[in-house]
Amino acid sequence: MRIGALITFLIIVTTACKQNFGEILVINGLTMGTTYSIKIKTNNNANKRNIRNEIEKILSEINQSMSTYIEESELSIINLSKSSDWQSVSDDLFTVINHAKKISVKTEGAFDITIGPLVNLWGFGSDKIENKIPSDEIIKSVKKNTGFQKILLDKTHMKIFKSNPNLYIDLSSIAKGFAVDKIALYLDKKKFKNYLIEIGGEIIAKGENAEKKVWQIGIENPNANNEIIKHTIRLNNMAMATSGNYKNYFKKDDISYSHIIDPATGRPVEHKLASVTVLSHSAMNADALATGFMVLGPEKTLSLANNLKIPIYLIIKNDKYFEEKYNDYFAPFISN
């Protein structure tokens, strides 16, 4: 889930297009069930139509490969297959699944791209079923068909094998970050040195904006008062991703059940972590880590992030207010 309302990430950019040192090409649209916004500092000789077309092509190809909503997507075909054979996959799909497994190991299983059936079971998935509390027996039964360890990869031949044929893979927690990285790679190859890419809250920024200043991201004050912006984050050659939990939940008997499902228990998490923001050189990496950290909770996240030297910013929900915490690796990126 990407954050809105109390915890909003606002891209602070100049709206003036033309300057004597170039202009900002803005490309907006819809992809992967969300919005995207790309700002590129160009010169007057840039083929803007071609840039837009190439970016739209990249997004379309990723969606056609990794969407679970497109019946004939590459991933949907794998999910529907009950084959006991190894299946060939595209380079992009292999890259994303391979990285997802690495993050699963790094987060001790907290990040898991196979828990879609559990998310659906609790009424938070694409099936749109009624929110209800499943029995222990049903949770145990569904959990048998989950587990990132059941995805085997052949790096030599770019193939995937599901040791459980009922395994269902959902890349929504990592694919947007991958798309951000791939567009950034395209812009780098085209020698663009200044841009900002955002897809569904996943961001990567490089160089300067139209005012010759480093791109800045404003973090809204979670405790609503006259101070709208709590911090301004300076991003250059860095990616940022945020995942959160406070808004998407249901209540039964005065107990709140979060949409964040712990793969280990098959149940919603019960900690007070409302959101986590991760900085990384890769948007795909930040995207997946943010999701995994939301499962771990504040204490384990701070400990693991410090051990791995990952910059993180946490919002923790207390009884009457939101508390912020960030580690020493995140502090240098705060400009106010």
Predicted regions and their residues:
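Mature catalytic core of soluble alpha/beta enzymes
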Residues: 2-9, 14-336
